[in-house]
Regions:
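Extended hydrophobic packing segments that form well-structured cores
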Residues: 1-31, 36, 44, 48-49, ...
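Short helix/loop capping segments that flank catalytic or ligand/cofactor-binding pockets
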Residues: 14, 78-79, 207, 213-217, ...
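N-terminal glycine-/serine-/threonine-rich phosphate-binding loop
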Residues: 32-62, 340-341, 347-348, 471
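A short, acidic, amphipathic alpha-helical segment used as a generic capping/interface helix at domain edges
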Residues: 52-55, 299-300, 304-316, 349-357, ...
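Well-ordered mid-protein domain cores that form the structural environment of catalytic cofactors
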Residues: 82-163, 183-189
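Conserved, well-structured core segments that form the ligand-binding/active-site neighborhood
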Residues: 132-321, 328, 348-361
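C-terminal catalytic subdomain
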Residues: 340, 344-447
């Protein structure tokens, strides 16, 4: 059969055996039905007025309260007119105004964590013209700055040693509200440093997305606050080899140490703030449409949202495990332009596929992936990546985990920090999160082929094999690794559509068990 796979800004055609199994999210197996557009406002309002495990906003918020509404950045969630963020913010504002909260006491805060701080065009795209114009010109929209210590609160360490530093405005508000997508010291001694605006607010609201995520199963809930409004030292408690290379991390589930740390850090933030986050998370489909909406306390709301999201995300598909997994990388996806050409980002994307689909892969599985791999690092977005790539080839760095000892050195390099704060770049420590993930592909495959690379030496420097075409790569894999009749899984559009976590057909029902 002939199939097209993403390659650069176009596609590369592959001739694969007719026995190849093809999976396209939302098409091969249909998503659960989404909420009709005309019912979204009412469904969102009903969720917000009937929160799980805590009182509604009309009882939590009062005249004179300060409120921070925490919003995911542009990486996930959709920007269509009916996107969850747009609708949830408007409904929440109506509830706050009805409770006596004044507009001047409300801040919209983007929870970008170590991602590039949300740009003005991105703010406009995410919020829409009406919301943007209501709040931007009065300086009531901001993006979390994890290096502005005037806006951070050091909460110390969890009992398990994790450092928690959070956004000061969220900490100080009367009611913190998290709008998400179900996408001091804690019990593990993790250091917690958080955003001060959130810490100081009377009401902190998290708007999120319950969306399949290789890091801990789902976005949203406590993952949102633990990664989005904290500091690199806090994120270094979980986005590291010691956590990501454990057996409980692959395949993806909500039962991993990483997920436990998200939850523990989130609860610790609530303990120090003196009140819980008010969450409003939407379960999203392949096209970022709302399947269901849940509000309330993250601890009680998360499991209920996951139960619904499991039906869309953990897909029983394979009758037997696969020898070969085939897909393609565009240049621009997920973390931005250059994701499919920057070698460190390429390796992270390859590994994310392993984390999601390990349940259907044989132990000696081979990956074949198209990438233009032309040397485009997008240095403005990932200014540290070229230096990391060069260092990886020197000074006894045999595998990517050997680079971990340089994390603090890069995380404190002033020029990289300035580019994160003021020039739209990722934080330098994000590169170490990416490398922690990137090694997982090597850990779980016999070989990985990049086909169509314009600069194949870059791919080979990351331990990847290179061939000109899918057909050449498959022939080599059949000769050396998988035999003459491999079971092949093809994943067209895998980086263009909302991802799933593939499972065996005879697996136990429910996420983490299929």
């Amino acid at each position: 059969m002939k199939l097209d796979f993403e390659y650069g800004n176009g596609v590369m055609t592959a001739q694969l055996p007719d026995s190849t199994k093809v999976f396209v999210p939302g098409q091969t197996v249909s998503d659960p039905p989404h909420i009709p557009e005309e019912q979204l406002v009412e469904a969102t309002r009903n969720s917000i007025r009937n929160p799980i495990g805590m009182p509604p906003l009309c009882q939590l918020a009062h005249a004179g309260n300060t409120v921070v509404i925490v919003i995911p950045d542009i990486v996930k969630g959709g920007c269509q007119p009916t996107a969850h963020r747009k609708i949830a913010i408007r409904v929440i504002l109506d509830e706050l105004y009805a409770a006596g909260v004044e507009k001047k006491d409300i801040l919209l805060l983007f929870s970008n964590g170590l991602h590039p701080r949300t740009s003005v065009p991105e703010m406009r795209k995410i919020l829409g013209e009406e919301l943007f114009n209501e709040f931007y010109h009065t300086h009531q929209i901001d993006s979390h700055d994890s290096e502005n210590y005037d806006d951070l609160v050091d909460l110390g360490y969890t009992t398990h040693g994790d450092h928690v530093i959070m956004n000061k405005r969220v900490f100080a508000c009367d009611l913190p509200i998290l709008i998400g997508h179900t996408q001091g010291y804690t019990d593990h001694g993790d250091h917690v440093i958080m955003n001060k605006y959130v810490y100081d607010a009377d009401v902190a609201i998290l708007i999120g997305h319950t969306q399949g995520n290789p890091y801990g199963g789902y976005s949203g809930g406590y993952k949102h606050c633990a990664t989005g409004i904290t500091h690199w030292r806090c994120i270094a408690a979980h986005h590291v080899p010691e956590v990501m290379h454990r057996k409980d991390f692959v395949p993806v589930s909500t039962h991993s140490m990483m997920r436990n740390k998200f939850d523990e850090i989130g609860r610790y933030m609530e303990e120090k703030m003196g009140h819980p986050f008010f969450c409003c998370d939407a379960v999203l489909d392949t096209y970022s449409r709302q399947i269901a909406i849940y509000s309330g306390c993250a601890e009680k709301m998360q499991p209920i949202a996951w139960e619904v999201a499991d039906k869309r995300t953990y897909v029983p598909f394979a009758e037997e495990k696969f020898d070969v997994m085939v897909f393609g990388m565009p240049i621009d996806f997920h973390y931005g332009n250059g994701m499919g050409t920057n070698p460190i980002q390429m390796m992270q994307a390859l590994s994310a596929q392993v984390i999601r689909h390990k349940r259907v892969m044989k132990e000696n599985c081979v990956i074949i992936c198209s990438s233009i791999c032309d040397g485009y690092f997008h240095d403005e977005r990932w200014p540290y990546a070229r230096e990391l790539f060069d260092l990886f080839g020197h000074d006894y760095h045999q595998t990517l985990p050997d680079m971990a000892s340089l994390g603090e050195y890069f995380a404190t390099k002033e020029e990289y920090i300035r580019k994160y704060r003021f020039a739209g770049a990722f934080h330098p420590y994000h590169g170490f999160s990416m490398m922690s993930c990137a090694h997982i592909a090597e850990m779980n495959t016999s070989a990985i082929y990049i086909v169509g690379a314009r600069e194949p030496g870059i791919a080979r420097a990351m331990g990847l094999k290179t061939r000109a075409t899918f057909e050449e790569a498959l022939a080599d894999a059949m000769k050396k690794y998988v035999g003459p009749s491999p079971n092949i899984l093809a994943l067209p559009q895998t980086f263009k559509l909302g991802a799933v976590h593939l499972c065996m057909k005879d697996g136990a029902a429910g996420q983490g068990h299929c």
